Amino acid sequence: MRIDVLADNLGFTEGPVWLPDRRIALTSISHGCLYVVDPAGGPVERIVTGGGPNGLALGPDGVLYVAQNGGIFGASGSAPAGVQIVVDGHVDYFATGMGAPNDLVFGPDARLWVTDTRAEIDYAAPEASPPGWVWACPLDGAEPERILEDGPVFINGLAFTGDARSLLVTATLSSALLAYEVASADSPTWARPRLVHTFDNGWPDGMVISPSGQAWVALTAADRIDVIDPAGDRCATIELPAGSLPTNVCIGGAHSDELYVTAAHTQSLLRVRFSDGDASMTECALPG
């Protein structure tokens, strides 16, 4: 396994996305912008969003969708909370009326699903913080639907399982990976998530699902990526440089066999390359 720093001095990085032109887009909460990094060493592009851009997703229309938290955490300024879109370098709003969007992903129903932390978390008294929300936003301009109203405090990353039957979310304060059975908004299954995994020594943040159905989860305080199989077992751990503070992860590369990690404390974007003989991955399928 080899880990390279592709770019640094990017601020508090989040939300990496592999683009069709083989560059990586990511957000910088502290710089109030998106950066687009060329792994081949080309110039870094900067797109100003204002506020605190958090998660990032690429739509089927080629548009970048930004979870704009409004600047509640570590941002250089404020902005209306909601979902922004980036088209040809221009930023506009796709949805507003949210609390503090954190991360987002496109679902099997073609809607954009968004975790909403709602407010800055009081770590000394987390019980005073509001429960997390999940929104589902149609792309046709219809109003977003609030699917989950009583989620975990500090709801964070999200992804759909490979069989599209469950929505996975990370509950950062409880170090848990939870699964909600996909159903209508009024279904009782949204009130009873299934505990998939409890993480050791680290707070789960963003994640990505590999083609084999494994969840690759960034653990901020632990400087590692844990790979969780569909049964809820940890099948591998990827140790990152000390002090990285990984916030999110995506799969990319020409053969979809590389991992890209936003390392917020070192203000950088990391690339992880694997080989078939990596001892740490013997029980897991590699990303590609």
Summary of predicted features, one role per range:
Residues M1-G11, P39, A191-P193, T282-G288:
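A short helix->beta-strand "capping" segment at the edge of beta-propeller domains
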Residues I29, N69-G71, T117-A119, T172, ...:
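Short loop/turn segments immediately following the C-termini of beta-strands
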Residues C33-Y35, A81-Q84, G132-W135, A176-L178, ...:
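A short loop-to-beta-strand structural motif that recurs across blades of beta-propeller domains
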Residues R2-A7, G42-V48, H90-T96, E143-E149, ...:
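A short beta-strand motif characteristic of beta-propeller blades
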Residues Y180-P188, R273-M281:
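Short loop/turn segments immediately following beta-strands, especially the blade-tip
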Residues S175-A176, Y180-S184, P193, H197-D233:
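Loop/turn-rich, solvent-exposed surfaces of beta-rich toroidal or solenoidal domains
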Residues P20, V36-E45, P60-D61, Q84-D92, ...:
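Flexible "stalk/tail and boundary" regions
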Residues A7-R23, G50-A75, P80, G97-L112, ...:
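Beta-rich, blade/repeat-based domains predominating
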